[in-house]
Amino acid sequence: MSRPRNNPQTSSPQDSTKDGSSFHYFQGRFELSGKSRQYPADALEPQPGIGDVKVIEKATKSMLDPAQRSHFYLVTPSLVFLCFIFDGLHKALLSVGVSKRSNIVIGNENKETGTLYASKFEDVLPTFTALEMSSILRHCCDLIGIAAGSSDPICTNSLQVQRQFKAMMISIGRPLHSESADLLISYNAGPAIDWINSRPWVGGLMFTFLFGEFESPACELLDQVKVVASKAQMMTYYTVRMFLDQCVDGSTALPAVVLEIPVFEQKKPLAKKVLGDFFEFGGVLRHPVIGVLSPQMFPNLATAANYWAKRRNSTFSGFEALDIIPGSTITFPVLQMASAQKISRGSDMDPYTLNILRGYGISGFE
């Protein structure tokens, strides 16, 4: 005699998990309180400070000395140098929560002080040589990495910074200092770049730097910042734009890429409308609308564009982008095969792909 078959709607393992009933098996086996061991009170992250504005010259002169500099949290000297160069920055930093007091390095103890200058300057107002001034400007030029969003792309001794500093020294009439202003060459700007970039107010700071009016030499310094800031942190957007305009191989017609072309083309005018004339600086200003142009919004298109750019354009050879954007479904073998073929422009192309490429004028389709 045949037995009746179980009703799959009532006995399916998949269905029984919908209300969590199958997990009763695990409940009660490991009963934990949910609490966790906490960090001790003295394990707070060290913080930089900028001292009192009345003694910023004393603090700056003191921080030129490596021995004095070594007593303080790594970011403190960089902030002091910036406050020395840019009048009014000290007050602005205090207004966004930067402390006057800085952590100091004393063994493993976590202590702080508001006195950032050496005792020998207690009753002396220091003066600065031209070489000292240029060295401070050189360090501030290193801090251009703030615009790049990280200390990784721009290192103290990178050729990019050297070129920008040389251009700045020529513009202020001190070309010889482009080589000799090295008093701070061993002081790494990286910690300050990353610390400032982690602050919620970094977008406001960059807006002031980029669009404020400054006299020399701050003006010439910020001219170099603008060179880096223009299109910074938006490289993937410009890579995709170039890919769609110039690529003539089969990778633009990959189905996964074609599906995301309308997404990219529709998000672009939204960002431009919100940012207006500031669009090319949107990444540096950390405007939230730039998120609509994140490569995660069109991962297959961004992956194909990065692959194409790194192979076809030497400008992008050092572009540090992920080879495969998270969320992408296309693979390198697929890209390799597609890029080895010229894009079809005949009747063999499926209507949807043809309409997308024609509709958005991709790769010269009309």
UniProtKB/Swiss-Prot annotation:
Residues 1-22 are annotated as: Disordered. It holds the Pfam family BDV_P40. Coiled coil: none annotated. Expression detected by RT-PCR in a few cell lines, including OL, HEK293T and MOLT-4. Not observed in HeLa cells. Signal peptide: none annotated. Residues 1-15 have a biased composition (Polar residues). It comes from the Eukaryota. InterPro entries: P40_nucleoprot_BD-vir (IPR009441), P40_nucleoprot_sf_BD-vir (IPR036260), P40_nucleoprot_sub1_BD-vir (IPR015969), P40_nucleoprot_sub2_BD-vir (IPR015970). Bornavirus is a non-retroviral RNA virus that does not generate DNA forms during viral replication. Therefore, integration of EBLN-1 must have occur through a mechanism relying on an endogenous reverse transcriptase activity. May act as an RNA-binding protein. Highly homologous to the bornavirus nucleocapsid N protein that binds viral RNA and oligomerizes. This is Endogenous Bornavirus-like nucleoprotein 1. It comes from Homo sapiens (Human).
